[in-house]
């Protein structure tokens, strides 16, 4: 991708300051809503939730919206053609990214802090680089491995701190989160061509709908009765589905209409800081020099990798 391509908005040929400001506003709201997800999940665990029940509650509230949107999109002949041609592939890739990666991520939250989870997931661009290098033979540009190394050092600082204060389960939780980030990176690479062929909205609806159906089937198979769950857990699960899944996806889509890819990617860099603020104020998680330095390293690492794309 050339610099001239990156400097063009995705759908607008003109970007007056009002459009840019609106785009930044939408992108920041989307990033903020995505970033408070770990806090909601930690609270859900406190009210007796587990990975499957939390995902099931999120699916109950989000999947109907995506299904309605999908049928709305299928009014167009082009979308119906793309659905028939790419629907199975989109469903498969969606289950990989929206079910398996999400399951590992939520399972990890039983063992690690919200701040550490967000930083581990935030490092997924490093896996995209490594997979592209090893599998697709795309040589990273100079300085990329240095940026990746700094990001891992930042995470290691927080893991070291949390191991001394929480225990060795930190390693299990970190491993689950890293696996989630790796699978999400695979999902991004696999979805890139599909999104260009069928459009991001239709792909997202099919992927989210398929993943949601899988988790609902799993919850029924495991005998989880949503009605018998703690009312506060149900409320948190619904909030996860609406405020941390559906709404941010719409806000990010709206931002994509008004911002260049580089502008959009920069707004996501505030995510770990937003998670830290809510984790400290709501969950009373500690924030030490280890966390501050680790966060700086990770954010710098990701920003550096994005600049080299």
Protein language model regions, located:
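Glycine-/small-residue-enriched transmembrane alpha-helix faces in small-molecule transporters
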Residues: 2-57, 95, 166-193, 211-213, ...
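Hydrophobic alpha-helical transmembrane segments of multi-pass integral membrane proteins
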Residues: 21-25, 52-72, 88-92, 143-153, ...
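Helix-helix packing/entry segments at the starts of transmembrane helices
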Residues: 31, 57, 116-123, 190-213, ...
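Specific transmembrane alpha-helical segments of multi-pass solute transporters/efflux pumps
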Residues: 33, 38, 70-115, 157, ...
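Hydrophobic/small/kink-forming positions within alpha-helical transmembrane segments
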Residues: 35, 39, 95-99, 103, ...
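Membrane-interface helix termini and inter-helical loops of multi-pass transporters
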Residues: 39-47, 51, 78, 106-110, ...
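Specific alpha-helical transmembrane segments that line the substrate/conduction pathway
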Residues: 53-64, 102-139, 144, 180, ...
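Hydrophobic transmembrane alpha-helices of multi-pass small-molecule transport proteins
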Residues: 66, 131, 140-162, 215, ...
């Amino acid at each position: 991708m050339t610099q001239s391509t990156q400097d063009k908005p995705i759908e607008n040929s003109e970007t007056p300051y009002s459009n840019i400001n609106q785009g930044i506003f939408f992108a920041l709201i989307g990033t903020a809503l995505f970033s408070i997800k770990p806090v909601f999940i930690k609270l859900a665990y406190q009210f007796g939730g587990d990975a499957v029940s939390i995902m099931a509650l999120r699916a109950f509230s989000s999947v109907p919206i995506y299904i309605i949107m999908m049928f709305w999109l299928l009014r167009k002949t082009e979308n119906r053609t793309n659905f028939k041609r790419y629907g199975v592939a989109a469903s498969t890739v969606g289950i990989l990214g929206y079910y398996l990666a999400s399951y590992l991520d939520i399972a990890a939250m039983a063992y690690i802090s919200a701040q550490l989870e967000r930083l581990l997931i935030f490092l997924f661009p490093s896996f995209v680089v490594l997979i592209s290098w090893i599998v697709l033979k795309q040589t990273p540009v100079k300085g990329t491995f240095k940026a990746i190394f700094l990001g891992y050092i930042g995470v290691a600082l927080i893991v070291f701190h949390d191991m001394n204060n929480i225990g060795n389960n930190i390693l299990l939780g970190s491993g689950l989160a890293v696996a989630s980030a790796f699978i999400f990176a695979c999902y991004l690479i696999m979805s890139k061509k599909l999104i260009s062929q069928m459009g991001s909205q239709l792909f997202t609806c099919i992927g989210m709908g398929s993943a949601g159906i899988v988790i609902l089937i799993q919850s029924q198979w495991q005998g989880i009765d949503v009605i018998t769950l703690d009312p506060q857990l149900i409320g948190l699960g619904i909030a996860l589905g609406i405020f941390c899944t559906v709404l941010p996806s719409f806000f990010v889509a709206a931002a994509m209409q008004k911002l260049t890819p580089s502008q959009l990617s920069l707004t996501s860099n505030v995510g770990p800081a937003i998670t830290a603020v809510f984790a400290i104020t709501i969950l009373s998680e500690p924030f030490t020099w280890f966390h501050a330095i680790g966060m700086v390293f990770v954010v710098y690492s990701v920003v550096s990798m994005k600049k080299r794309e």
